[in-house]
Amino acid sequence: MIRTRHVFLFAVLLAFASSQTPTPEAKSSEQSLEENKFFPLPPTTPFPTNAVAATDEDGEELCTSDKTIIEKLLNNYKSFRTPSESGVIVWIEVWVQEVNSVNEITSDFDMDIYVTELWMDSALRYEHLNPCKYNLSLNSEILDQIWKPNTVFINSKSANIHKSPFKNVFLMIYPNGTVWVNYRVQVKGPCSMDFSAFPMDQQSCHLTLESFSYNNQEVDMQWMNWTTPLSLLKKEIVLPDFVMSNYSTSLKHEIYPAGVWNELTMTFVFSRRYGWYIFQAYIPTYLTIFISWISFCLGPKMIPARTMLGVNSLLALTFQFGNIMRNLPRVSYVKALDVWMLVCLTFVFCSLLELAIIGSMGARSENRQAQQQKQQDEEATKHQKGRENSTCSHLMSPSSCPNSPRICRNHIPNDVPQSFKSYGSTDPRMRKRLIIASSSTISHAPNANRSEKVLLLDGLEETQFSQVETKFSSMASIKMKKHWTTEEIDRLSMIMFPGLFTLFNIIYWTYYLTVNT
């Protein structure tokens, strides 16, 4: 009986000694805990513990329940005291769940995000209490009873923790005192709107996190450095008007009168999806411009039809421009769409200006033709009256003619050369024949007495003046031939307008499609 008792006591002592001897796994666990005392592990890494559950006489493990651990941790806990006198490091991570909207009118964006905070609180260590679990998952009621870094979105317009159906706050405490807090927040932040390249623009939106109550001497806020501090829960975030093209994080130190604060900034870049504007603005303006060029093919006689095409094109462009611009904020600088519309309006206006030039030239040409026709009719009438009033005979002597040789131009004797007989003719074509005659011909005219010579010399004076007048008229006709006709201007416009518009398109699309990249 006594021997049996000694064997039992030896077994108990052996079991106790083996339980107190640390295994290699336990040693590594202790070393891991010491290494992560101030730099917590990622939340996905299970926190080991060196606590070994004791057993009762029946062989059942004895561990401390979560309720008991919480009661002991919160007993005499001071929530207003920072976890460390030398300051605490708070690690931040953000997961983007969804972007709800990007508003150009109010210059902001709305999104749902998960905000993760990690810090060490030595007052919440419970590994020595032999816990039944390696972590404690608690609700927001316990979070209100412990110390928090009071993280805020310092530049947000609004921020609310989701309540669907309860407050979306997650709290986990690890045995080494690591506190992991996660919020699901709907936040509205500002955007730096720049519409210079609209609708090929990119907009940048920012959210800044910082501790509202503690400067960086007490709370040193940092982005998580062992994982991606900012990530998307979706592969791609696409909105009706925008797509998230880039996102990044940054850290800067902001100086306030109360000290220096660490500001953690998230930057989101949204690129506009301009397909809607291609179909609603650019393609209709292309068609309007092409329609305005049809007037060049109608000819200078179709002034009313060409005017209708030009005016309707101008009104259509103005309506399209106003319909698109009314949904955008009023800015004082020129946008890419403004450049497009103004240039298109300029092309349509220039087509109307070309039409005005064609119409003016056509009207002047018609007036000139009417005056020439009227002048020809008057000359024909005078010629007819001169024939009827001619009463002198071609065979009369010179003495029977009047004293003034200008009145008796048709009364030249038959022996005068034929080139001089036409002097008195009112036909302009016949009058030009006097240019052939010279003074020597006149002086040697047969049977020409003094009166006849006076008559012919008088005719020579008018012939010389007529020759000078004919030279000037021929020079004027040469100059008139150098002027553009309406048909030539239309043909030139059919080449210049499409060519200049094509050049503008190359410059426009090359610049605005590459300005953001």
Swiss-Prot record:
<dbReference type="InterPro" id="IPR006029">
    <property type="entry name" value="Neurotrans-gated_channel_TM"/>
</dbReference>
<keyword id="KW-0407">Ion channel</keyword>
<keyword id="KW-1071">Ligand-gated ion channel</keyword>
<feature type="topological domain" description="Extracellular">
    <location>
        <begin position="516"/>
        <end position="517"/>
    </location>
</feature>
<dbReference type="InterPro" id="IPR036719">
    <property type="entry name" value="Neuro-gated_channel_TM_sf"/>
</dbReference>
<feature type="region of interest" description="Disordered">
    <location>
        <begin position="368"/>
        <end position="403"/>
    </location>
</feature>
<feature type="transmembrane region" description="Helical">
    <location>
        <begin position="305"/>
        <end position="324"/>
    </location>
</feature>
<dbReference type="GO" id="GO:0005886">
    <property type="term" value="C:plasma membrane"/>
</dbReference>
<keyword id="KW-0732">Signal</keyword>
<keyword id="KW-0869">Chloride channel</keyword>
<feature type="compositionally biased region" description="Polar residues">
    <location>
        <begin position="389"/>
        <end position="403"/>
    </location>
</feature>
<keyword id="KW-0812">Transmembrane</keyword>
<dbReference type="InterPro" id="IPR018000">
    <property type="entry name" value="Neurotransmitter_ion_chnl_CS"/>
</dbReference>
<keyword id="KW-1003">Cell membrane</keyword>
<feature type="transmembrane region" description="Helical">
    <location>
        <begin position="495"/>
        <end position="515"/>
    </location>
</feature>
<keyword id="KW-1015">Disulfide bond</keyword>
<feature type="glycosylation site" description="N-linked (GlcNAc...) asparagine">
    <location>
        <position position="246"/>
    </location>
</feature>
<keyword id="KW-0406">Ion transport</keyword>
<dbReference type="GO" id="GO:1902476">
    <property type="term" value="P:chloride transmembrane transport"/>
</dbReference>
<feature type="glycosylation site" description="N-linked (GlcNAc...) asparagine">
    <location>
        <position position="135"/>
    </location>
</feature>
<keyword id="KW-1133">Transmembrane helix</keyword>
<feature type="transmembrane region" description="Helical">
    <location>
        <begin position="278"/>
        <end position="298"/>
    </location>
</feature>
<keyword id="KW-0868">Chloride</keyword>
<dbReference type="GO" id="GO:0034707">
    <property type="term" value="C:chloride channel complex"/>
</dbReference>
<dbReference type="Pfam" id="PF02931">
    <property type="entry name" value="Neur_chan_LBD"/>
</dbReference>
<dbReference type="InterPro" id="IPR038050">
    <property type="entry name" value="Neuro_actylchol_rec"/>
</dbReference>
<dbReference type="GO" id="GO:0005230">
    <property type="term" value="F:extracellular ligand-gated monoatomic ion channel activity"/>
</dbReference>
<feature type="compositionally biased region" description="Basic and acidic residues">
    <location>
        <begin position="375"/>
        <end position="388"/>
    </location>
</feature>
<protein>
    <recommendedName>
        <fullName>Acetylcholine-gated chloride channel subunit acc-3</fullName>
    </recommendedName>
</protein>
<dbReference type="InterPro" id="IPR006028">
    <property type="entry name" value="GABAA/Glycine_rcpt"/>
</dbReference>
<keyword id="KW-0813">Transport</keyword>
<dbReference type="GO" id="GO:0004888">
    <property type="term" value="F:transmembrane signaling receptor activity"/>
</dbReference>
<keyword id="KW-0472">Membrane</keyword>
<dbReference type="InterPro" id="IPR006202">
    <property type="entry name" value="Neur_chan_lig-bd"/>
</dbReference>
<feature type="glycosylation site" description="N-linked (GlcNAc...) asparagine">
    <location>
        <position position="176"/>
    </location>
</feature>
<dbReference type="InterPro" id="IPR036734">
    <property type="entry name" value="Neur_chan_lig-bd_sf"/>
</dbReference>
<comment type="similarity">
    <text>Belongs to the ligand-gated ion channel (TC 1.A.9) family.</text>
</comment>
<dbReference type="InterPro" id="IPR006201">
    <property type="entry name" value="Neur_channel"/>
</dbReference>
<feature type="signal peptide">
    <location>
        <begin position="1"/>
        <end position="19"/>
    </location>
</feature>
<dbReference type="GO" id="GO:0005254">
    <property type="term" value="F:chloride channel activity"/>
</dbReference>
<feature type="disulfide bond">
    <location>
        <begin position="191"/>
        <end position="205"/>
    </location>
</feature>
<keyword id="KW-0325">Glycoprotein</keyword>
